[in-house]
Amino acid sequence: MDYSENVQNKNFTPISQPPNLTRDQEHAIMVSTLRQVISNTGGDTSSSHYIAASEALPPSDAGPCPLCGVTSCYGCAFPQHEEIKQEKKHKGVRKKPSGKWSAEIWDPSTRTRRWLGTFPTAEMAADAYDEAAAALVEKRSARRGSKKGEGSIHQEVGGGDD
């Protein structure tokens, strides 16, 4: 029996292992490769996908990433990471699948979430949350009453009988 196929060739050089990529990074590479195939661009079709993907990634000895500070970070080079960085986070505000923004606030007196509405922008939803939070603070301070010598948070200006 000939077992020559199990013997390694002395001229064989092993291919270096690909870097550990996250699922999002692999997905981005596959999508860009498919776009190149569908649009019939991308140059030489005989080159391996790993080589094409590794050219899109920054070199591993590039130093720490300016966004996250991790050495040899591959995630910050992808657009999904940049989009996440650009979004501001507002308390009580979340983005719905439809692209609109919803706002809600926890009402401790009724122990329920109070729906504030759906808004076209995150800033409008945050403003609605801020107004509702201010109303809750007013309600709480009015319920507690002001102590002797202390004024309320929102003092009335003028219009009083002297």
Swiss-Prot record:
The keyword Metal-binding does not apply. It comes from the Eukaryota. Residues 87-98 have a biased composition (Basic residues). Its main location: nucleus. GO terms for cellular component: nucleus. It is found in: Nucleus. GO terms for molecular function: DNA binding; DNA-binding transcription factor activity. Keywords: Activator, DNA-binding, Ethylene signaling pathway, Nucleus, Transcription, Transcription regulation. Residues 1-21, 84-103, 139-162 are annotated as: Disordered. The keyword Transcription applies. Residues 89-146 bind DNA. SUPFAM superfamilies: DNA-binding domain (SSF54171). One of its GO terms (biological process) is ethylene-activated signaling pathway. Belongs to the AP2/ERF transcription factor family. ERF subfamily. Probably acts as a transcriptional activator. Binds to the GCC-box pathogenesis-related promoter element. May be involved in the regulation of gene expression by stress factors and by components of stress signal transduction pathways. This is Putative ethylene-responsive transcription factor ERF121.
